[in-house]
């Protein structure tokens, strides 16, 4: 199912490592990107604005192919 605004997602480490975004940033990714659910706030082209609510951090833009719907969200739509 395609990711859309309001979806709960997690970052996929394999897709984020060695990406263009990894080359432009510190690649010591915070664990909350992969271990907690983030909500899609906005979509623009291939990118989604994600707010991870478990920690007080600003939202981040990630490519949609670097995201996977979280288990809880995917199960509730099945």
From Swiss-Prot:
InterPro entries: NdhO. It is an enzyme of class 7 (translocase). It is found in: Cell inner membrane. One of its GO terms (cellular component) is plasma membrane. It catalyses: a plastoquinone + NADH + (n+1) H(+)(in) = a plastoquinol + NAD(+) + n H(+)(out); a plastoquinone + NADPH + (n+1) H(+)(in) = a plastoquinol + NADP(+) + n H(+)(out). Its EC number is 7.1.1.-. One of its GO terms (molecular function) is oxidoreductase activity, acting on NAD(P)H, quinone or similar compound as acceptor. Keywords: Cell inner membrane, Cell membrane, Membrane, NAD, NADP, Plastoquinone, Quinone, Translocase, Transport. It comes from the Bacteria. It is a peripheral membrane protein. NDH-1 shuttles electrons from an unknown electron donor, via FMN and iron-sulfur (Fe-S) centers, to quinones in the respiratory and/or the photosynthetic chain. The immediate electron acceptor for the enzyme in this species is believed to be plastoquinone. Couples the redox reaction to proton translocation, and thus conserves the redox energy in a proton gradient. Cyanobacterial NDH-1 also plays a role in inorganic carbon-concentration. NDH-1 can be composed of about 15 different subunits; different subcomplexes with different compositions have been identified which probably have different functions. Belongs to the complex I NdhO subunit family. This is NAD(P)H-quinone oxidoreductase subunit O. It comes from Gloeobacter violaceus (strain ATCC 29082 / PCC 7421).
């Amino acid at each position: 199912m395609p990711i859309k605004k309001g979806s709960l997602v997690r970052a996929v480490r394999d897709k984020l490592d060695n990406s263009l975004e990894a080359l432009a940033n510190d690649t010591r990714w915070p664990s909350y990107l992969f271990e907690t659910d983030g909500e899609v706030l906005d979509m623009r082209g291939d990118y989604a604005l994600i707010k991870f609510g478990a920690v007080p951090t600003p939202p981040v833009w990630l490519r949609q192919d670097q995201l996977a719907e979280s288990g809880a969200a995917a199960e509730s739509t099945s």
